[in-house]
Curated annotation (Swiss-Prot):
Catalyzes the conversion of 4-hydroxy-tetrahydrodipicolinate (HTPA) to tetrahydrodipicolinate. Pathway: Amino-acid biosynthesis; L-lysine biosynthesis via DAP pathway; (S)-tetrahydrodipicolinate from L-aspartate: step 4/4. GO terms for cellular component: cytosol. (S)-2,3,4,5-tetrahydrodipicolinate binds at residues 146, 155-156. It comes from the Bacteria. Belongs to the DapB family. The keyword Disulfide bond does not apply. The keyword Cytoplasm applies. This is 4-hydroxy-tetrahydrodipicolinate reductase.
Length: 255
C-alpha cells in the first residue's frame, strides 16, 4: 500500500522538488498540497488547500513541510495532532520547540523527522566534523546559501556546532583580547566556535568546517549544487517515519 503524502509549501523550490520526487515513486501517493497563496483548486489533478485547518479530517500518512520558519512549528504540531507523521525541512526551530514536539509525538505514538539538511553528504559532513572536533577543538564554520534564505545561521550549521560541542573541549576560538572593528566581523559565537553566514545569488547550500592546529589544518566541505541532492533524504524520511513512534531531530537517526 502506498504511503499517502501531503506537501505543505509545495510552490517553493524545495516543495516542487519534493512533489516531483513523490510523483515518480510508485511507493508514494501525493494526495494533497498546501499553499496559502495558491489561487487554483487543483495542481496536476491533486487537491490544493489554502488553510491547513481544512486538512484536519483528511486521510494521509505523512506531512512534508517546506514552508517558512514563521509557521513551521505550528504546522508540525498540527500534523501530529491530526495523525500525520511530519517530515520537516523547514528550519528555525528552537531547542525548546524540538523538545516539546518530541514529547508530543510520543503521546500521539507517531514518528516524525525534523532535518536541518536532507543531503546525505551533509549528514556525513556533520559526523566527520564531530569526530574531528575531539582532536581539533579550534574550529570555525562557514555556511553559504542562496540569498532568499530567511534564517541565519543555517540549521545545518547550528546542528553541526551542537554535535561538535558534545565532543569538543569547550574553548573560546580566537585571541582572548581580540577586538571587532566592525560589529559581527567574527561571526556568531556558539560555545566558543564561530559561525559565519554567506548569502549570495547563485548559491544553493554549502558548508565548510575549518579546523586548525599547530602547523596544520583540516577542512571539511559539502556542496549541494541542486535541490535534487536533498530528495534522497526526503524519500528516506517519508518511508521511515511511518515505522517509528517518536519524532527525531536529524536525518542521521534514520540511517
Amino acid at each position: 500500500m502506498s504511503i499517502r503524502v501531503i506537501i505543505a509549501g509545495f510552490k517553493g523550490k524545495m516543495g516542487q522538488a519534493a512533489c516531483q520526487m513523490v510523483l515518480t515513486d510508485p511507493d508514494l501517493d501525493l494526495v494533497a498540497v498546501l499553499d496559502p497563496f495558491e489561487s487554483e483548486s487543483e495542481w496536476q489533478g491533486i487537491p490544493v488547500f489554502k488553510d491547513k485547518a481544512d486538512l484536519a479530517c483528511f486521510e494521509a500518512d505523512v506531512w512534508v513541510d517546506f514552508t517558512t520558519p514563521a509557521v513551521a512549528y505550528e504546522n508540525t504540531r498540527f500534523a501530529l495532532e491530526n495523525g500525520f507523521a511530519p517530515v520537516v525541512g523547514t528550519t528555525g526551530f528552537t531547542s525548546e520547540e524540538i523538545a516539546e514536539l518530541k514529547e508530543f509525538s510520543r503521546t500521539q505514538d507517531l514518528g516524525g523527522l525534523i532535518a536541518p539538511n536532507f543531503a546525505l553528504g551533509a549528514v556525513l559532513l556533520m559526523q566527520f566534523a564531530t569526530q574531528a572536533a575531539k582532536y581539533f577543538p579550534n574550529v570555525e564554520i562557514i555556511e553559504l546559501h542562496h540569498d532568499k534564505k530567511k534564517d541565519a545561521p543555517s540549521g545545518t550549521a547550528i546542528k553541526t556546532a551542537e554535535l561538535m560541542a558534545e565532543i569538543r573541549e569547550s574553548i573560546q576560538q580566537g585571541a582572548a583580547d581580540e577586538e571587532e572593528l566592525i560589529a559581527g566581523a567574527r561571526g556568531a559565537d556558539f560555545d566558543g566556535m564561530r559561525i559565519h553566514s554567506v548569502r549570495l545569488p547563485g548559491l544553493v547550500a554549502h558548508q565548510e568546517v575549518i579546523f586548525g592546529n599547530q602547523g596544520e589544518g583540516l577542512t571539511l566541505r559539502h556542496d549541494s549544487y541542486d535541490r535534487i541532492s536533498f530528495m534522497t533524504g526526503v524519500n528516506l524520511g517519508i518511508k521511515e517515519v511511518v515505522k517509528r513512534h517518536e519524532l527525531v531531530y536529524g536525518l542521521e537517526h534514520l540511517l
